[in-house]
Amino acid sequence: MAATAAAVVAEEDTELRDLLVQTLENSGVLNRIKAELRAAVFLALEEQEKVENKTPLVNESLKKFLNTKDGRLVASLVAEFLQFFNLDFTLAVFQPETSTLQGLEGRENLARDLGIIEAEGTVGGPLLLEVIRRCQQKEKGPTTGEGALDLSDVHSPPKSPEGKTSAQTTPSKIPRYKGQGKKKTSGQKAGDKKANDEANQSDTSVSLSEPKSKSSLHLLSHETKIGSFLSNRTLDGKDKAGLCPDEDDMEGDSFFDDPIPKPEKTYGLRKEPRKQAGSLASLSDAPPLKSGLSSLAGAPSLKDSESKRGNTVLKDLKLISDKIGSLGLGTGEDDDYVDDFNSTSHRSEKSEISIGEEIEEDLSVEIDDINTSDKLDDLTQDLTVSQLSDVADYLEDVA
């Protein structure tokens, strides 16, 4: 029974298989499956042939470079860099691709070949870093040296000119003062030297007790002594007329900033325009006789009458001349000075009284002008003695 049952089942399976195949063929599915299987088999066979006949990847330029000594040195430096920082994955790709699985040098051999000396047990970084540092030092070495030379050249020239200028400016001033000192005549009095020192001061008020004002007023009172003083001043004026361009030494002094007063009155002389500049230059060292009338001892105030003012001024001048005579200034050579002055001067014969009267008239005119302008605080009288030539002199009255 069992055998018959198995035979029946086998027949039924065969019928079902045939029925399935027939159904698949009728629908076209079976043929499509057969074609796909056949294509897959053919593709597998083709792929197998390609893999067997495939050539290895080779970079010809890299291969030629690595065949040289420098090429192997560079590849060894890169491999040492990757090994120093434990870049294993990158190293696993680098070595097969460059075909450098073997033949690369270690760190010690590289350091010896490059001339890098390392202390035992001390590793500061990869050898590639040390090579770059040495290249930078070689590049910066000449430039820094040139820069140092340039800096020395830049800073050194200014020092030498400064030294030269300082050496030149100091002696340039000394000969000027020495030259002026040598050009002074030996016959100059002590009072004249003090008068020259007084010219550098802005406040030139005259007092009766100072020998400076005594010597300057002595020039106004005695005509004979004026001749000797003017002869000495003329020599200084001629010498200093050539030194007039050196006006830098005169800067800073208020006396030289004031304009030179114009002469208002002359006494019996003729003007010579050619020598006027020299005569004015001779007055540069003479002190201006600026003094307020109220500052003179015994002089009345400005509110007194005009006649009393003139008389008091004349009395003061006589007093000063007497005091200077008592001090012994200008004595001993008065007769010679009188002879020289009288022989060479072209002045009109005027006595001290006539000159005093003219001074009194000038003072009266000046006081009238001051009274009309309501400026009665101070009156400054500048009596300047100068000489336009060797044979003439004049007096200036400046309010």
Curated annotation (Swiss-Prot):
Residues 163-172 have a biased composition (Polar residues). Residues 205-218, 286-302 have a biased composition (Low complexity). InterPro entries: FOP_dimerisation-dom_N, LisH. One of its GO terms (biological process) is positive regulation of cell population proliferation. One of its GO terms (molecular function) is protein kinase binding. Residues 70-102 form the LisH domain. PROSITE patterns: LISH. Residues 139-218, 232-308, 331-353 are annotated as: Disordered. Gene3D superfamilies: 1.20.960.40. The modification Phosphoserine is found at S152, S156, S160, S202, S301, S326. Residues 259-275 have a biased composition (Basic and acidic residues). The record marks K173, I174 as: Breakpoint for translocation to form CEP43-FGFR1 or FGFR1-CEP43 fusion proteins. Residues 245-256 have a biased composition (Acidic residues). Keywords: Cell projection, Chromosomal rearrangement, Cilium biogenesis/degradation, Cytoplasm, Cytoskeleton, Phosphoprotein. Its main location: cytoplasm. Homodimer. Part of a ternary complex that contains CEP350, CEP43 and MAPRE1. Interacts directly with CEP350 and MAPRE1. Interacts with CEP19. Interacts (via N-terminus) with CEP350 (via C-terminus). Belongs to the CEP43 family. This is Centrosomal protein 43. The gene is CEP43.
